[in-house]
């Protein structure tokens, strides 16, 4: 472990309130046929571009914002110069008005947003920001990080920012702005949160750092033949030196791919949706794709150290097959009662009983035809979808309850069009939605 502590800046930067004047020149002419929409629909696609005010990152404040959006780097257009390598953070209120700031992009992974009661958390390689009603706290990161995997809110108010590369790095942001960095070399795996700790699932082939300790722990646990590869649940936020703590071990299963750990553990039991490859040998020699297989649940009991594999079956009792176009590494999931509910990157929603593995297909979210896929967030009641309409450069936020009832539009806005698309004689590019977060307690009338 390579720990160091970053001291906070003295005080947070207070954001200044600036109201942009709206002139007729800024108003975009657009013809919209009035339709009968519910009171929850907040339409602002004809609002002027001046409704979004640009500020420095340290001048942002939450204000009346209900949604925060992080836009990716621009996508290259043939024959034109390379697009800028930066991101935009845009905060919008329910009418599509708000603030925007240009920030440096992280090169690898997906740069996420985390909006908690403490404020909106986001970062760049050398700084972390926490934006509240009072302004933005800017915190220097002494060892810059060019990648990001996920942000987690810990029970005591700390925020953990995880980055993956040749090893695993965790930047823990304390409530008063101090950053504590932990780096574990030669370690890879799928990372998630279990209570107050950050944990991962890996094996001795992917993580050389645990090899000796994992085989020793398995020998003490089983007393039988030693497998060639040992799988393990590890704790990465409080390692033993350069080695993560081992929480459980079991023989590694050939071709078992651990899915994204987006569901918190239930007590001492971790349940992760995973893929069992149909033919691992064919994958290794290149004749099959890595995601050709079937869905399973991987359950680890940290009290006993035991792992159980549960097949996931559809309503007809058949395995659910996966392939390159229908896999779960970009799924969003949540635990609701005894069910693991998730939505795939293509908008297919399922519920899986965590004990039996019986699955139900809940719905498929109708999506606009677009070059940029929709981005999802989940709650205990349903799925929030943020989509980008390529033809009109409009963003639409909608909601689909888990128990049915149809897709409901919550907000439509064109005020971000100049940040989504750049068209001129010298440059042309399009940005996509990298991530978004909703203000805690705001549902847009979805419930």
Residue locations for each model-derived region?
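Cleavable N-terminal export/targeting peptides
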Residues: 3-6, 10-11
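Surface-exposed loop/turn elements that mediate protein-protein interactions on large endomembrane-trafficking
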Residues: 48, 79-108, 124-146, 163-186, ...
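Repeated scaffold domains used in trafficking and secretory/extracellular systems
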Residues: 53-58, 104-117, 144-156, 184-196, ...
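N-terminal export and membrane-targeting signals
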Residues: 16-37
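Short beta-strand elements that form the blades of beta-propeller/WD-repeat-like
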Residues: 59-82, 112-125, 150-164, 190-223, ...
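C-terminal hydrophobic structural anchor segments
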Residues: 372-396
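N-terminal "mature head" segments of proteins
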Residues: 2-3, 31-170, 428-447
